[in-house]
Structures are given as structure tokens and as C-alpha cells.
Amino acid sequence: MNKSELIDAIAASADLPKAAAGRALDAVIESVTGALKAGDSVVLVGFGTFSVTDRPARIGRNPQTGKTLEIAAAKKPGFKAGKALKEAVN
């Protein structure tokens, strides 16, 4: 399912126009992104938790040349599925 299909599903499920469903989805995405940028996690009980983890710097290798290089530390967004979501999928 892509974003436009998700908007269609939200519009049908919530009996909203597609434009309103699209704005609602965009607002959710912006809110989650903003919270993660601020260093907070977003917990949706039963669905899952969005969080940011720190990935330390490491040594990598260019596969074409074999030369080693340092890969900088980075922040990595993550998602851990909640119990209800896991049960619904299985």
C-alpha cells in the first residue's frame, strides 16, 4: 500500500473527503517527524512506538576499491510494533 492508497482507505473508513484524509495523514506524519527530531518517542498504544536510536561511527569499506573509510555517527529512526499489531498480523 502506498500513500495514495492509504489516503483512500482512511477516507473510506472515516467517511471523509480524500482531501481531508490526505491533510490528516500529512499532519500525523509531520507530528511524528517533529517529535522524533526533538528527541522524543511517539507511542501509539496497541500499534507501536516510533523512536530514534544513535548509530555509532564505524569503519566501512568501498567494495569497488577495497579502501577503508570512516562512516560518521548518525541518528536512525525506528519502529517497534505493539502487541495488538503483532497479533493482528499473525
Swiss-Prot record:
Q: Report if keyword DNA-binding is assigned.
A: yes
Question: Highest taxon of the source?
Answer: Bacteria
List GO molecular-function terms, semicolon-separated: DNA binding; structural constituent of chromatin
One Pfam family of this chain: Bac_DNA_binding
Please give the InterPro entries that the UniProt record associates with this protein: Hist_DNA-bd, Histone-like_DNA-bd_CS, IHF-like_DNA-bd_dom_sf
Q: Which GO terms describe its cellular component?
A: cytosol
Keywords, alphabetical = DNA condensation, DNA-binding
> Biological process GO annotation list?
chromosome condensation
What role does this protein play?
A: Histone-like DNA-binding protein which is capable of wrapping DNA to stabilize it, and thus to prevent its denaturation under extreme environmental conditions.
Oligomer status and interactors? Heterodimer of an alpha and a beta chain.
* Similarity field: Belongs to the bacterial histone-like protein family.
The name on file for this protein is DNA-binding protein HU-beta
